[in-house]
Amino acid sequence: MHVNSIEAFLDALRQELEVPDHRYEQAERSYTSLANWLHRDGSTVSRYDPQVYCQGSFRLGTAIRPHTEAEEYDVDSVVELRLLTKREKTQYQLKLMLGAEIHAYHDAMDMLKPVREGNRCWILDYADGAQFHMDIVPAVPNHNQHYMLLNSLSLDTRWASTAISITDRREPNYKLLTDTWPRSNPKGYASWFASRQAIVFERRLLIATEN
């Protein structure tokens, strides 16, 4: 009885905090729209094959509902220019180049709130009714360098193929042409997270079966 009460409480809490499906759909429409813009005729970045995808809690499915209507969902996303390398541009140049496209997208979509710049990203604030903003991190592939690093440390390389390098204006080499950029791997982390969740699910299923 006690266990059932706890499970009922946790289920009620989950439903209270859970993000509605239409919010996920809204976020997906937003970064799909941005991806289409970056691939349009006349885009200054289309030749680099930009890929837009979400990261963080929205990718993991762990986002929680804001406490009040005044608070917003933070949709973290990445724009990975898959045919661009760190040998061609600095972090600063990449961020400026993508920023120009994001400003143009903002104007073309008649968005009212101005584009903001974060340390690692550009930020698009959507209309008040949408109740979310999108952080857009510029990135380039980093799978080879990341694989070699993990391999040299005898660490798991299963998810190295999706590693990226990102921009951060706080870095001392932000305006220098160098291979030393901040590293990230949101796709790899999501895959690792899913694998851990699968293990937890299997354990719970086994316990439920035994009981």
Regions found by a protein language model. Name each.
Residues L38-G42, L60, Y92-D156, A163-S184:
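Conserved catalytic core of two-metal-ion nucleotidyltransferases
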Residues E7-R14, E25-E28, T32-A35, K95, ...:
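Generic detector of well-ordered alpha-helical segments enriched in charged/polar residues
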Residues P50, V75, W122:
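Residue-level detector of short, conserved catalytic/binding motifs and their immediate flanks
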Residues M1-E72, L83-Q93:
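N-terminal regions immediately upstream of nucleotidyltransferase
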